């Protein structure tokens, strides 16, 4: 029953999965994994108190179940019990120091509070170290587009005279691999994975497992453009018909320069996505005093918009320059979404494209994360039925796009120069949390 529940959940049949887990527990009340899976299902359904009870039962049955402590922490944070959530994350890390999700969740608490930059950055970097420490190749292979990015970055670091353990051997081996005729021909095949032999693995791993993060310079004052009247910007957004606007010259020149260098130099781009782009996240190394100060500036200078809402998280996406399509249509579980671009316009081959398409109809409150993010056909059908307008914001260097996070959005087609510094990079900040409705909360 538990195994069937897992399969049904993967197929999106959440209610049927829940029934399977409950049946398994009725047969064996001490079935640890069934209690845990039931808790995860309740959380997806927005029934947080029931999820909390499930995780507490798992811990009662096995106090050393690190994932259960971590998952309980997630629920407690959503319920506003921050100190108890911290204790859960700490317990999970104590049991399993390499539990990446517990470390990232712990870091995110300090990030969202915006009161202790040093601890927030330290905890985030600890999470990145866990990733690098445990880095390994899946089935002795690497995605071709990821290797292409990593060698471009390694060459950039070499050109800037950064000395990183294993970098020369990495460049030599990666060059040989990408130079093979079959890989040259398939360079734009985002799904291709390259099978590696043991010698290649041993040559690539030391560099890939090494941490390296750019230390941004100290900036006094605001990191967002001090010449703008931000209260006017705020009023314009609040009075807009559809809660979508763009803001040019968003960051100060100094902050923009430092964020760009951070994104080019830092080895933080670990999350692979199908459309040939890489993600880096605030709770796992994509963080600096400037990143955090931007959030504070937004809360202070646009107090009606951002003041009431906690920073959720922020991240960066870095795209393959030859990418045709960007991020698939999706919405975010937040109140406000701020997206800004930091690759100079000279690298964009199509000045009318490369930006963001936003649809001005919010996602239904009762949709789950999978509805928001995975089922593209269902989303487009919903948008058509609700006569959604598509607002297409073209790409521009240092342009920010501010919109209601419940709006579905997707990256426009991308055609940037095929070189490392030409890769399109965007930063996204989420404020507030839009929870699935539940009769229990």
Give, region by region, the residue ranges found by the protein language model.
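Residue-level detector of the short coil/turn that links helix A to helix B
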Residues: 12, 46, 80, 114-115
């Amino acid at each position: 029953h538990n195994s069937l529940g897992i399969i049904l959940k993967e197929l999106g049949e959440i209610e049927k999965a829940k029934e399977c887990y409950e049946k398994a527990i009725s047969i064996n009340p001490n079935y640890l994994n069934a209690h845990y899976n039931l808790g995860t299902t309740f959380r997806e359904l927005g029934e947080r108190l029931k999820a909390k009870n499930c995780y507490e039962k798992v811990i009662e049955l096995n106090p050393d179940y690190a994932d259960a402590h971590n998952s309980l922490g997630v629920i407690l944070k959503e319920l506003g019990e921050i100190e108890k959530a911290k204790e859960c994350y700490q317990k999970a890390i104590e049991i399993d120091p390499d539990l990446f999700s517990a470390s990232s969740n712990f870091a995110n608490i300090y990030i969202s509070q915006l009161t202790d930059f040093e601890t927030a950055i330290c905890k985030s970097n600890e999470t990145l170290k866990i990733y690098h420490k445990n880095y390994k190749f899946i089935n002795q292979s690497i995605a071709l587009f990821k290797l292409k990015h990593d060698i471009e970055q390694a060459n950039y670091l070499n050109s800037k005279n950064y000395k990183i353990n294993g970098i020369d051997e990495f460049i030599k081996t990666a060059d040989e691999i990408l130079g093979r005729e079959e890989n040259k021909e398939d360079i734009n095949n985002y799904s291709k994975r390259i099978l590696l032999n043991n010698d290649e693995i041993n040559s690539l791993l030391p560099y890939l497992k090494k941490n390296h993060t750019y230390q941004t310079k100290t900036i006094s004052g605001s990191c967002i453009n001090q010449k703008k009247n931000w209260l006017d910007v705020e009023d314009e957004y609040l009075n807009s018909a559809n809660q979508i606007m763009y803001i040019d010259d968003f960051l100060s020149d100094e902050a923009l320069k430092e964020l760009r260098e951070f994104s080019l130099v830092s080895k933080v781009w670990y999350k692979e996505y199908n459309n040939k782009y890489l993600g880096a996240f605030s709770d796992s190394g994509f963080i600096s005093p400037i990143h955090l100060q931007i959030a504070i500036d937004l809360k202070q200078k646009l107090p009606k918009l951002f003041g009431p809402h906690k920073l959720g998280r922020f991240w960066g996406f870095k795209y393959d320059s030859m990418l045709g399509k960007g991020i698939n249509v999706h919405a975010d579980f937040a109140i406000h979404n701020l997206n800004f671009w930091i690759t100079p316009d000279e690298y964009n081959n199509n000045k009318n494209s490369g930006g963001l398409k936003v649809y001005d109809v919010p996602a239904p409150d009762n949709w789950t994360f999978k509805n928001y993010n995975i089922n593209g056909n269902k989303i487009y059908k919903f948008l058509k039925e609700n006569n959604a307008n598509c607002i297409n914001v073209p790409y521009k260097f240092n342009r920010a796009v501010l919109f209601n996070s419940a709006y579905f959005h997707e990256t426009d087609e991308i055609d940037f120069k095929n070189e490392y510094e030409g890769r399109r990079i965007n930063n996204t900040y989420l404020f507030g949390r839009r929870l699935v409705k539940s009769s229990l909360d």
